[in-house]
Amino acid sequence: MGLVGKKGCCGQQRKGKGIMNNKKNLKMKPVGSEYMEQYNALLRYVFQVTEQELSSIGWQEREIIRAKFPTMEKADVIGWFDDDNLVSQVAVYPMQARIFGRTYAMGGLTGVGTYPEYSNMGLMHKLLEQALKNMKEHGQDICYLYPYSIPYYRRKGWEIISDKISYEIKDYQLPKNHQVPGDVRRVDTEGEELKAAYNRYAMRTHGAILRDDLAWNEYWLGDSDDIMAAVYYNENNEPDGYVIYWIAKEVFHIKDMIFNNEEARTGLWNFVAAHFSMINQVEGDTYTDEPLAFLLEDASIKEIISPYYMGRIVDFVSFIEKYPFKPSVLDREWKFKLIDPVMECNQGNFSLTISREGCGQVVRIMEPCQDEINIQTMTTMLMGYKRPE
């Protein structure tokens, strides 16, 4: 999707061509690592990232390219080319996500962009369609993305599946210290302790992404060198949570805090509150249903709830075969018409049967159905973000 921003392409002036000439020369194909600089330049243009902004966090253009190179080699990147110039692109990272205790192959959609002079030509729709077909071939039954335009992705079949809560806590509102059996240890941000803590958390958390080296590389990309981490270990010396943070201008910034239980949550907030004399407030984001204000003695903190990830079922039949429905004393059946604006394999009339044990099966049917649902609603419902009324 094209975004009209500042003139030029990261210092490069785009050649002015007519729309008809563009169409004649355009070709969709995989984007190899030899196009890494063009790939990065297009992202920089679309998201309006300047050299000054990169330098402010200690990054240089070449460092970004080197950091992105291993990720791009493993990703499925496709784009439109005008002769040999990359003008529109999407990237899909091979990932895994935990969905109600099951591990699903997931496609992480990112790197989406089109130069403005090539917008309104249907290029991105065709790229997304091909990317989804590739995901289906790779067995990736669901796709996650972090949207810059919720309405646009809704039209293509994605829907909100999680929220982000941004909060501000004044120093005098920090929770009081409470005794816990474990302890908090500061660790190397690139060490195995942090990964072990996250793996324990992700395996038991619905919707969490299982991070391999590729995912960790993306997670850290763009962070400053000042970022730090601390892990909470329980009395059995098992990592039950962590906080990733940095301190600047008397503000304790929390990039991420995860915990498996109340003990770990308390221990990590004890650690944050121990910085009381160094800071004026704490700012951070949380991506869970944690009732943060409720858990504080002074609950009058600032919280802003905003959409976070969007998700999309890629292959409905395959997704249902793996999905753990709740057991019941009765077999269940639902007949409905499913609508998908992009994937033909998901369009049509279906019968969903669920056994008493919670195993689902979907078959196509020819008979007309009174109920109708689109893939967006089906996704957010099965992901547990919204329940049917």
Question: Where on the chain are the PLM-derived regions?
Answer:
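Active-site rim helix/loop that mediates acceptor-substrate recognition in acyltransferases
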Residues: 43, 50-97, 206-229, 321-324
